[in-house]
């Protein structure tokens, strides 16, 4: 495809126009009085949202240079959302302010590289101040307040606080559709996976069609259980104890399945067979998770273990196992706490190292099953559009609350940034264009607070002047229009969200300022209109 190239001011101006198109659309959503944006779809109902990253994803500009500028800001929003789950609009507003302030100085002859260094140094100092000023999350009410601000709904805040209180920081909180109006919260106790009994003959409770095993042995194998000899050997190990047995295998077929069913019907010993979850390497990893949770050892050819020659040391234990047609839950596995903690640490490391959203999600699910639990918030609303929008807000609020637990809280409403920048301004000592770069940050840092005030119908400049005179932690509560101690009022932001927004905005601003040429795809000429058919006259 042919390319078109622009240089210097002309290149940056085209990108700036695209940045402004996107940022001006997104920033109207900032703060408690922020507005919604309607996103048209090529099919189905339109989406109504105030989520910055969702809006940014939908914007695709026609001009190639504007499109590149918009894509750079989309990256700011996406990175902030990936790391913290919120703060996308704040990051976009900061990026716009930093780029505008920076380009003024580049146009007047400042060195872009020195400006970039100054921006980076000032941002690092502000982030350091934010982390030092953070207040740890100590109560369920603090989690509820943080989630309430993110979702804009006190009921959602309470549900999320209850869910995280139950499953812990490493637990998973998922959001699903509900066929009833309102919010419901369900918890999963123990490790649950999406595989049920292989045969309905294993059912022990006819009323709800489940098989419940109390204090069972657990056999885990990465291969198939097919021969009758395998079952006879396993039965000899278990029958003497009088305990039931759960078998988790790639499959149970051949002579093995009817042998197990027959023994169950005759009452010789109580057993349930289920297929192992997942495929390939993920299946191996999940079997190993189960082994560590229950104190078992996975029987596999790789380890030189055969079903017809194992002893009872490879069997795991649990307080209870509940198996339905579609899923299996292992409650209170007997694995060692030290082994479980080590496995949790390993999975955490894998999450940090992974650059795939899908892999991270699956690893997080495994982590939750080992370390915490799973809570499901079910969302119902009057219309599909409303349900979709509410579901999205709840997902963001969950990640926001987890970010607060992880790194602590700061006063919200853009106040923490302004006050941390005030402290940084006193300590950052730079010269020349680096000092100019730092000043760019100290001026641009006001943009989120200014935008929140303007979205609430107030004068941004007046609010900023007022906030600068207030004690640390006090500022504008845009929801009420009052100036107060924001921590006491429950107007807070997670440190992780605030610092990620600043770091990502500063990074993109630096790239913007140091751009000297833009190579874009040449737009395709419009196709000629089709010739009209001869009507035969």
UniProtKB/Swiss-Prot annotation:
Q: Name one GO molecular function term.
A: ATP binding
Q: Please give the chief subcellular localization of this protein.
A: cytoplasm
Q: A Pfam family matched by this chain, by name? A: Cpn60_TCP1
The record's listing under InterPro entries reads: Chaperonin_Cpn60_CS, Cpn60/GroEL, Cpn60/GroEL/TCP-1, GroEL-like_apical_dom_sf, GROEL-like_equatorial_sf, TCP-1-like_intermed_sf
Which Enzyme Commission number(s) are listed? 5.6.1.7
Task: Spell out the NCBIfam families in the cross-references.
Answer: GroEL (TIGR02348), PRK00013.1 (NF000592), PRK12849.1 (NF009487), PRK12850.1 (NF009488), PRK12851.1 (NF009489)
Which PANTHER family is this protein grouped with? Answer: 60 KDA HEAT SHOCK PROTEIN, MITOCHONDRIAL
Q: Output this protein's name.
A: Chaperonin GroEL
What species is given as this protein's source? Answer: Parascardovia denticolens (Bifidobacterium denticolens)
